[in-house]
Amino acid sequence: MSQADRTAGLDPDNWDELRAQGHRMLDDMLDNLSTLRERPLWQAPTPEQRARCRVALPRGPGRLEDVHAQFMADVAPYGSGNRHPGFMGWVQGGGTAVGMLAEMLAGGLDANLGGRDHMPIEVERQVVAWMAELFGFGPEASGLFMTGTSVANLCAVLIARDRALGADVRHTGVRDVGVVAYASKGVHSCIIRAMDMTGLGWDRLRLIETDADHAISLPALEAAIAADRAAGLKPFLIVGTAGSVDVGAIDDLAGLADIAAREGAAFHVDGALGALGVLAPEIAPRLAGIERADSLALDFHKLGQAPYDAGFLLVRDAAAHQRTFTYSEAAYLRHAERGLAGGEWWPCDFGPDLSRGFRALKVWFQLKTYGLDALGAVIGQVCALAQTLAERVAASPELELVAPVGLNIVCFAYKGADNAAIVADLHDAGRVAPSTTTLNGRTAIRAAIVNHRTEPQDIDALVEGVLALGRAQAARG
């Protein structure tokens, strides 16, 4: 019976043919990864390619090799470019071949890590234990893989909310309660959105002024807390940033931990970008205080170089973490003493998802394959390249730094030019791809150096490209 004649069942008629096709697909992607420099970083899909993608809903079967051929022709060459060594536009890692292979294994297992007793969950538990050790949270900490730090930060705000308002808030909902959270003006927008989604509201988040290094001003924070206390409000959460989205600034985490302890507020660190800097000896001292956080969010798909997506939440108090998410009334989620429904803690009791993919596997593979020292060396390398870029900018009379370089992000401008147009032209050229941001009302070129493949030649290409385009603008008047 052919695939076309089947009424049910999706396994192939011929496993050998599928195996051969699978090998071709794997070889194609390994070839693709190993030749990134030979192709444009980014190119816009043509109208014809978009049209070929926008077809009627397929009712009948197709040939896997034809779908693969379309992918290689119309999809693979037109990605966002973050794997390319010249990509510096947004804070995205470059992925790894090891991570890609691990994703293949995870897809083959098709494990749901929502709960129950199976080894894929043990892999996630092991990574949680490693992160608890790395960040000094201790063996009683809990953690969970998530899509990204946006969701991890949301969960951290929920945990802090329930800590302040009590478990009954899960039953009664948020009423007119006098609690307030604090973060710097450079905090990621997902913290602001989390205040909305947790029912607390944007008005209960104080965005505090930053200092010359774009880190939160501790005196301004203390003044805001004093004003809120005088108005009868209670601080419940202080958010520190380890690598701000615009400039890579790192807040004084130890100072924030002191203030949070004094005020009885939860201390959360958004470490999406910079938390893994603890692996780099030259960066780690600047993250002092991160080990005192009540919760920490980070992304392995940034400086950790894991393929998307691999967000992570670490929580010091596992019991408080579980109280925020567990729901014991669902009979279909009842734990058993033995059998498949047994096992230790279930991830679904520590987060919003019942259906969870095997995100932990690619991180587990990378940590075991490369080791922490190699990952730390990559982080040190990209931060050193950022300093190299800053030095190149400072040495050019046509360019200027727009912000201090705190980690791996360099914000600069071509003096008197349309810098947004320069960035767009660089994208179209396909060699390097920074992004733009706005600092103090000015448009700046923002180079976020994250990719483990980026080398000094890519820094040279960026500087030379900006200079050439800026000079061309000036010549046109």
Residue ranges of predicted features:
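PLP-dependent enzyme catalytic core of the Aspartate aminotransferase-like
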Residues: L439-G477
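Conserved PLP-enzyme active-site core in the AAT-like
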Residues: M119, G148-R323
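Short Gly/Ser/Thr- and Asp/Glu-enriched loop/turn motifs at secondary-structure junctions
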Residues: P139-E140, D176, A403-N408, T438-A444
